[in-house]
């Protein structure tokens, strides 16, 4: 009588192997999704100095996002990461399409730091965000990861007396301090910014109108002017 044992063993191996493969595939997907470069395919750009809120979180915690020290050492980044990890991973992709230059009219007060993107609302929250110390005149450095170029940058600064620890940024508590012209496509752009006599803790709000299409980016950077 012919034995069927080898055939049964094959079925058992396949039945055991399939769940194992599914588990491994799921684990790989989760790991890749948590890598700091997971959003790099959506490459765009951001202000790297003074670092925007999302970029500062990624720069400080991207390689150690599971470190429990983040909760106590950098509570605003911790809250942002808990609310949506993608806020930190995709620091370069805070954009909206089709604003046709109407960014102020189409961005409500209190939503400037997130570019009115609900997924990034944690960036609007007032609190102890890490601040970059700058002089009253400093060089803003922008990293255009995809070399989109710029139609313009507009730089705003909160008014004297504004408290980043308790107030959201709105159009009524910022002033336009710098407007640039066009920049050809390149990865690194820098220009001078004067803080117009302000001192202490402030929020720098930057608007970038990319040249390659109707895309508008907005970010907040926390600064300490000395």
Model feature map: region roles:
Residues 167-194:
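Extracellular carbohydrate recognition and processing domains
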Residues 161-162, 195-200, 226:
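A short, structured loop/turn motif at beta-sheet edges
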Residues 2-43:
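Secretory targeting and sorting signals
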């Amino acid at each position: 009588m012919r034995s069927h044992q080898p055939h049964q063993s094959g079925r058992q191996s396949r039945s055991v192997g399939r769940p194992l493969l599914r588990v491994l595939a799921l684990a790989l997907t989760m790991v890749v999704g948590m890598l700091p470069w997971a959003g790099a395919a959506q490459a765009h750009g951001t202000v790297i100095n003074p670092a925007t809120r999302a970029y500062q979180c990624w720069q400080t915690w991207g390689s150690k996002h599971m470190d429990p020290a983040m909760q106590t050492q950098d509570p605003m980044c911790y809250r942002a990461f808990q609310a949506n990890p993608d806020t930190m991973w995709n620091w370069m992709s805070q954009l909206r399409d089709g604003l046709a230059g109407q960014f102020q009219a189409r961005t409500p007060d209190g939503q400037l730091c997130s570019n009115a993107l609900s997924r990034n609302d944690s960036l609007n929250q007032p609190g102890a965000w890490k601040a970059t110390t700058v002089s009253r005149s400093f060089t803003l450095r922008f990293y255009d990861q995809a070399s989109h170029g710029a139609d313009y940058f507009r730089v705003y600064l909160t008014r004297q007396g504004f408290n980043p620890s308790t107030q959201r940024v709105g159009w009524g508590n910022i002033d336009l301090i710098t407007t640039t012209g066009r920049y050809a496509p390149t990865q690194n752009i820098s220009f001078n910014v004067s803080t117009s006599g302000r001192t202490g803790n402030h929020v720098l709000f930057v608007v970038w109108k990319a040249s390659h299409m109707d895309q508008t980016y907005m970010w907040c950077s926390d600064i300490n002017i000395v």
